[in-house]
Amino acid sequence: MTDTIFALATAAGRSAVAVVRVSGPRSSEIAAALCGRLPSPRLASVRTLKHNGVALDAALVLRFEKPASYTGEDSVEFHVHGGRAVVEALLAALSELGARLAEAGEFTRRAFENGKLDLAQAEGVADLIDAETEAQRRQALGQVGGALSQRYDRWRDLLVQALAMLEAAVDFPDEDLPEEVAERARPGLRQLSAELNAALADVSRGRRVRDGFRIALIGAPNAGKSTLLNGLAERDAAIVTDVAGTTRDVIEVPLVLGGYKVLVADTAGIRETADVIEAEGVRRAKAWAEAADLRLWVVDGFHVKQADARPEAIRVGDWLILNKTDIADADASAHVAERWAGEGLTVLHIAGTSAEGPEALRAALASHVADALSGAEFPAATRLRHAERLSEARSYLERALSDVGLEVELAAEDVRLAARALERISGRIDPEDVLGRVFSTFCIGK
């Protein structure tokens, strides 16, 4: 028999209300032991919870009968006062009555096992809980609603249709079938291959929405990188002094720009140094910048002629920030800006020593991030697991396209394998260890 499980579904600690969730075959029995007469299903009712004759709390009780519950099982929710003592007393009573504390993600795993949602939707639930920005909320909510799953299912259906044509050509070679029956599968497979390519190209966008768009502030020591970071963060996140080389490590600050999560990093000033610690900071700065989605080369406007020498690591798409332009040589700044704009860099003039400077940079970055991450209405794949299976399906599909007309049996097998790769995203045929990894990332009460 399946265990009856329980957990605190709201955040631990002092609060006005705490929600304790119970799910499993003995949910109603255990709830009745605590509150006596059970409320009707899906009707919230106030009950006094008692255990061993001792009152625990006055609670709002909700009961759900299977399959009309989150988990697909009989379930009960207790909405109690959020004091630690009240919650601990209720959890202890549930344990004594025969329920056990749920494992991480166990409620959602039961929902998956009972067909209430598929694996991609379950991952969307985890992302929705972790969402910090409006973009992350929209992305995760679309995934929970089944937008990704519906797309994958449509692709699988197209593969099944193509497979039927290919297998007809294999299984009935002597029947009066049109000679081109196998070739009829080719246009649909080509279209699907193009859609898979587009989805894989969009994976990086989805992952940046979920994990954050990475922006690196790089440049020579004392260019004003730390001052700009503090201005963007609107707090003293980095130490600012007149001493060159103050920043020795990468300082990451999470921000929300234009509704998207952004990680801005202040890095050690790039220069040759005999100082072992500073040299390690420079190495880390270069590594972080190499992996960044956008790199801002900050140049001290007071020494703007330094920007005449092209840094070796600079690349098209980088930004050149002419900082401290309120004290810079205007003619020299204009010359440098014109030169670097011609090299494919975006050039911004920032008065980093005033309040307007960081604000102007923040607005420019918000616009850039929104342009980079805004996409189609459906959510993009955000997880490496999805990208791997999509890439696998594309490989099988490309091989099938090369086999159609030559080795129909091989083409049919490749189409079958492509369909199975898509099925693994939704969890239809995933092994137990994959399921365990997915649900282990959840909180206990979900």
From Swiss-Prot:
Single GO molecular function: metal ion binding
Q: Where does Mg(2+) bind?
A: S226, T247
Keyword Transport part of the UniProt annotation: no
The coenzyme or cofactor needed here is:
K(+)
Listed transmembrane segments = none
| Assigned keywords, A-Z | Cytoplasm, GTP-binding, Hydrolase, Magnesium, Metal-binding, Nucleotide-binding, Potassium, tRNA processing
Q: Which domain of life is it from?
A: Bacteria
Instruction: Name the residues that bind K(+).
Output: N222, T241, V243, T246
CDD domains reported in the protein's UniProt record = trmE, TrmE_N
Q: Which residues form the TrmE-type G domain?
A: 212-370
Q: Which NCBIfam families match?
A: mnmE_trmE_thdF (TIGR00450), PRK05291.1-3 (NF003661), small_GTP (TIGR00231)
The family assignment reads:
Belongs to the TRAFAC class TrmE-Era-EngA-EngB-Septin-like GTPase superfamily. TrmE GTPase family.
**Subunit structure, as described in the record:** Homodimer. Heterotetramer of two MnmE and two MnmG subunits.
**Full protein name:** tRNA modification GTPase MnmE
Which organism's genome codes for this protein?
Caulobacter vibrioides (strain NA1000 / CB15N) (Caulobacter crescentus)
Gene name, Swiss-Prot/TrEMBL: mnmE
